[in-house]
Design a protein with these regions (language model features):
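Short juxta-domain linker segments that transition from a proline/glycine-rich
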Residues: 1-182
């Protein structure tokens, strides 16, 4: 819940119609430079130059999410690490993967703050497109966030997110509750 609360504080600065510009301001306030380039990968961070490069080909909601991911790693690294200290990881690699996952969670929570998002889900009867427009997020980001709404006393409905490719292969799945996959 501490990660959610920290992300909600960041979310208060992501207001207005130009969320990308607001996100750039948040990252640059941390002493990092943001630039856009025509490149296939979504993001690249140059540690030496403290420069975040984002794909100019990515949708604005993806660019905003990637900047919030970088902000999580830069400004809230100690919080992420303290949260991860509660886990028992078998290797440093496993912890690194979990840290990136937690930073991604932070990014989603910054773009779609818990209480506001839960209320919007109820108000729209979980209409993914309406929620996506309201928060400037993609359908996939909204579906993923819906699957994480498990705060005690303010839980969302059990929501299962599954992404499937054209061949029917599951390429991503997420749920905070149990769902058995064959």
């Amino acid at each position: 819940e501490a990660v959610d609360k920290a992300a909600e504080r960041v979310a208060t600065k992501l207001t207005g119609s130009d969320r990308v510009r607001a996100a750039i301001g948040g990252v640059e306030n941390e002493g990092r430079h943001v630039r856009f380039a025509n490149m296939p990968e979504l993001r690249r961070f140059d540690e030496l130059r403290q420069e975040l490069t984002l794909s100019s080909l990515a949708a604005p909601e993806t660019q905003t999410f990637q900047m919030m991911l970088q902000l999580a790693l830069a400004r809230h690294g100690k919080l992420l690490d303290a949260t991860l200290d509660l886990g028992r990881f078998q290797s440093d690699a496993a912890r690194d993967i979990a840290r990136l996952g937690l930073a991604n969670y932070f990014a989603g929570a910054a773009v779609m703050p818990y209480s506001q998002f839960l209320q919007a889900a109820h108000d729209t009867r979980h209409d993914l497109e309406l929620i996506a427009r309201r928060f400037g997020a993609s359908i996939e980001q909204v579906a993923h966030r819906l699957s994480t709404l498990q705060r005690p006393g303010a839980k969302g409905i059990p929501f299962f997110f599954v992404r499937v490719d054209q061949a029917g292969t599951i390429t991503k799945r997420h749920s905070a509750t149990r769902l058995q996959f064959a």
